[in-house]
Each structure stands twice: as C-alpha cells, then as structure tokens.
Curated annotation (Swiss-Prot):
Annotated pathway: Metabolic intermediate biosynthesis; chorismate biosynthesis; chorismate from D-erythrose 4-phosphate and phosphoenolpyruvate: step 7/7
Cofactor: FMNH2
GO BP, sorted A to Z: amino acid biosynthetic process; aromatic amino acid family biosynthetic process; chorismate biosynthetic process
Protein name: Chorismate synthase
GO MF annotations in UniProt: chorismate synthase activity; FMN binding
Gene Ontology CC: cytosol
Annotated cofactor note: Reduced FMN (FMNH(2)).
Family: Belongs to the chorismate synthase family.
Domain of life from the UniProt record: Bacteria
InterPro entries named among the record's database cross-references: Chorismate_synth, Chorismate_synth_AroC_sf, Chorismate_synthase_CS
Keyword terms: Amino-acid biosynthesis, Aromatic amino acid biosynthesis, FAD, Flavoprotein, FMN, Lyase, NADP
PROSITE patterns (alphabetical): CHORISMATE_SYNTHASE_1 (PS00787), CHORISMATE_SYNTHASE_2 (PS00788), CHORISMATE_SYNTHASE_3 (PS00789)
Keyword flag Cell inner membrane: no
Length: 363
C-alpha cells in the first residue's frame, strides 16, 4: 500500500491499523533545537481521543504517545522523530459477523477490490484511528510554527442541520463539540441524544484558521498553498469537501464583493481565505471541511457479501455517531503540517528575498 507519506521537506509517514498492536509515525524534516516534550503532543491527542463524552465512540484509548527518536535532552536533534501509540481497547469479535460483508458507504468494498484482502476489524487501515498519528505529528508542526508567530485553531461550524455562528474562541475548548457559541451547546447535545436513540449518524462542518502566517508561502503552479491544503484536509477520513475562504459561496458573489480590496491600513475583507494565486497573503488562512455521516451504524442496511449475494448489514462495535465531533484537532494538525512544509520550502528558496512594500495588517 502506497500513499502513506505526506509532505516534501516536513514529511509525515504513518502506519498501523485500528485493531493492530500499535500506531506509528515517522516525522522527517523538523528543524533541530525545537524544545519538545511528550505533553506538547499529548495535549492535542487528548483533544482527539475517543471515549471523552457520550457523543463519541465509547472505545477507551488513552492514546499515550511515546517518542522513540529525534529528541534529546528536551530538544529536537534534526533526526527522524519516531512516534508510537499502543492500541489497548480493541474488541475485534464485534466485527466477526461482517467479515464477509461490505458495509455500505465504507471502504470495505473498494479495499477488497484493490488489494484482494482486507482487515475487517474496525476498518483496519481505513479507520480514523490512524489520525491519532497525524495529530501527534501535527502537534510538532504547531509547536514550531508557534515560534514563528503562527497559531492554528479550529472549531465546529455546523452539525447536521444546526448552523453554529462563531462567537468566541474562549468557549471552543469548554465543550465536547469544539463549539464557538456556548449558547448552542444544549441544542447540539439534544440533537445528538436523539440521533443516538434513532440509531443513526450525521455529518458536520469544521472550520480551521491559521493566524500570523507571513506572505509568500506556496509554490505555484501545482503546489499552490490552497491546493495542498485541500489535499491534506481531503485526506482525512470522511471528508467529502473542502473550501478555502468564501469557497463555493463565491459563485453567487460579484467581483465587487469578492475582491479583497487593500488600503495602507490593511485588507478590507478576506474572501480569499488568506491565499492569492496559491500564495499566502498575510491574511488569516481559513478553510472549511465537510465530513459525511458515519457509515457504521446499527440500523440495517442493504449490501452484498464477498460472493455478490444480497445481504443486510448491521454494524456492531463502537463508533462515532458524528465523526466531525473529534475532527477539529485532526484538521488543525493537517493544516500545521502543510504550513510548516511550505515554510521550510520557502526558506530554502526565498530566504534572501526582500521587498520594500510593507506587509498589510490582518483583519
């Protein structure tokens, strides 16, 4: 299986399955001398880990990360950083009844046709369990970016039919939904409680924002910053769409509304989401991602078995009724990985570039 590595100068390679003994990652390209300890990684892993509320899977994983290499006396050495998270709460017997069946809207059918063999236990490699390593690697990127004044934060902007207006970052970490409007939390909880009674699942929309990004990151033509962000965010399990800035809303906008006019005091808007011509403009980088409803639900669904016979599938096991609830730290991680990769690439080619034009203030 190829496609397990992301990035060019700052690279992340992951391995491991949902019900295997462990998940691992190799992070290459981290600059030396960065102060780094386990808590830097564990902080974000705890935000993503399962079993933290009644609205997520009840699989209990501590997700305690181990740093195997690349850090000495509390600082990165420039060598590859090896990371490991042990799986401790697998219940593979929950999946024995569907080992010869294909769950609708899941990767079972496509993995079977591509590889001729699949790990049916919890989805194997296709499980979102893999994203724990992305979060750990992304935490390293976030730590370095912070030394450059770059801060990445995300929040839930929609759950099912419920639109969530942004009010304050202060409430995002105070609830299970990463909700920026504390007044919306009771409505979200009631919706999820009913969803669980209905034995169903629902999608969500996540917004992730990077502030403090300098102008100049991005490598046209094929490595545009927005293209690589879309690639990174689309690679997250269950993501079916990515928007940068105004996104698809630009279709209904006129040029006079969409263009981000400039004054000596700064930009007057940020419809572009902080990226112009594939290069960061110095404005906040804003991305939105849409996640589909969880495929694995207990409501019976029509499918086939490996011999092509009709079958009804009832998925047991422990699953998130809304994968978007835990997706915010994953989206932050992938944005951080992309930005650090492009920061290092920009430094390698353009470190000596200097212009007299001032950097415009952010909105």
């Amino acid at each position: 299986m190829s496609g397990n590595t992301f990035g060019k100068l700052f690279t992340v390679t992951t391995a491991g399955e949902s019900h295997g003994p462990a998940l691992v990652a190799i992070v290459d390209g981290c600059p030396p001398g960065l102060e780094l300890d386990l808590q830097d990684l564990q902080r974000d892993l705890d935000r993503r880990k399962p079993g933290t509320s009644r609205h997520t899977t009840q699989r209990q994983e501590a997700d305690e990360v181990e740093i195997l290499s690349g850090v000495f006396e509390g600082k990165t050495t420039g060598a590859s950083i090896g990371l490991l998270i042990r799986n401790t709460d697998q219940k593979s017997k929950d999946y024995s009844a569907i080992k010869d069946l294909f769950r609708p809207a899941h990767a079972d059918y496509t993995y079977h046709h591509k590889y001729g063999i699949r790990d049916y236990r919890g989805g194997g490699r296709s499980s979102a369990r893999e994203t724990a390593m992305r979060v750990a690697a992304g935490a390293i990127a976030k730590k370095y970016l912070a030394t450059q004044g770059i801060v990445i934060r995300g929040y839930m902007s929609q759950l099912g039919p419920i639109q969530i207006p942004f009010k304050t970052w202060d409430s995002v970490e105070d609830n299970a939904f990463f909700c920026p409007d504390p007044d919306k939390v009771p409505e979200l909880e009631a919706y999820m409680d009913q969803l669980r009674r209905d034995q169903d699942s629902v999608g969500a929309k996540i917004t992730v924002v990077a502030e403090g990004v300098m102008p100049g990151l991005g490598e046209p033509i094929f490595d545009r910053l927005d293209a690589e962000l879309a690639h990174a965010l689309m690679s997250i399990n269950a993501v079916k769409g990515v928007e940068i800035g105004a996104g698809f809303d630009c279709v209904a906008q006129r040029g006079t509304e969409h263009r981000d006019e400039m004054t000596p005091q700064g930009f007057l808007s940020n419809q572009a989401g902080g990226i112009l011509g594939g290069i960061s403009s110095g404005q906040p980088i804003i991305a939105h991602l849409a996640l589909k409803p969880t495929s694995s639900i207990t409501t019976p669904g029509r499918s086939i078995d490996v011999d092509g016979n009709a079958a009804d599938v009832i998925t047991k096991g422990r699953h998130d009724p809304c994968v978007g609830i835990r997706a915010t730290p994953i989206a932050e991680a992938m944005m951080a990985i992309v930005l650090l990769d492009h920061l290092l690439r920009h430094r390698g080619q353009n470190a000596d570039v200097s212009v007299a034009t001032p950097v415009l203030a952010q909105l």
